[in-house]
Amino acid sequence: MHADSEALATLPADPVSQLAFRDAMSSLAAAVNVITTDGPGGRAGFTATAVCSVTDQPPTLLVCINRSASVYETFIENGLLCVNTLGNGQQDLSNLFGGKRSQQERFDGGQWESGVTGAPILNSAKLALDCKVTQSVSVGTHDILFCQVLDIRDQGESDALVYFARQYHHLPGAAPAA
C-alpha cells in the first residue's frame, strides 16, 4: 500500500497530543502480563499490556519496554524473557510488578520456576510464553522486542485479567464442553 503525495500533503503536520493518544489507548482492552527475565544481567520483571502476536512461522510475539525503565538494561543484556499472562485474582501481582518495589519484593509475590530459557515462569500464570529476543527496534521512548516463542505453558480455560479504561476487569474462561 502506497499513499500518493497529494493525499499525504493533506494530513495534519503535527501528531495528536500525548494525552489524547493515552486516552484513546485506554479504550483498547488488553491482557495483563508480567514480563520476566533472568541471566547475566540479573533477574527482573515488569507489568505490561503492550504484548502482541507477530507471526506463527516462526512463533513470534512482541513486547514493548520503555528505555527509561529501571529494568531495561537487564532485559537487553539477558536477551530472553517470559510473558506471564495473569488471571483472575492476580491484580495484586500486576500492581507489585508495575510499582516501585525492589526486584526481590516483586518476585517474592509469587511462586516461580525457570523456563527453558532460564526466564522465571509464574507457576500460577494463565499462560506463560518463554522466549528469546531475536530483534529490537527503537520507536520514540520505547524498544519493541521481537521474541521467538520456545515454550508454552497454558493453564487452559482459566479466567483472564484484562486492563481497560484504566481499570482491571475479569473475564470468565470458556465454559466446559458438554
UniProtKB/Swiss-Prot annotation:
Catalyzes the reduction of FMN to FMNH2 which is used to reduce pyrimidine by RutA via the Rut pathway. Its EC number is 1.5.1.42. Belongs to the non-flavoprotein flavin reductase family. RutF subfamily. GO terms for molecular function: FMN binding; FMN reductase (NADH) activity; FMN reductase [NAD(P)H] activity; riboflavin reductase (NADPH) activity. The keyword Oxidoreductase applies. Keywords: Flavoprotein, FMN, NAD, Oxidoreductase. Gene3D superfamilies: Electron Transport, Fmn-binding Protein, Chain A. GO terms for biological process: nitrogen utilization; uracil catabolic process. It comes from Pseudomonas savastanoi pv. phaseolicola (strain 1448A / Race 6). The keyword Kinase does not apply. This is FMN reductase (NADH) RutF. It comes from the Bacteria. It catalyses: FMNH2 + NAD(+) = FMN + NADH + 2 H(+). InterPro entries: Flavin_Rdtase-like_dom, NADH-dep_flavin_reductase, RutF, Split_barrel_FMN-bd. It holds the Pfam family Flavin_Reduct.
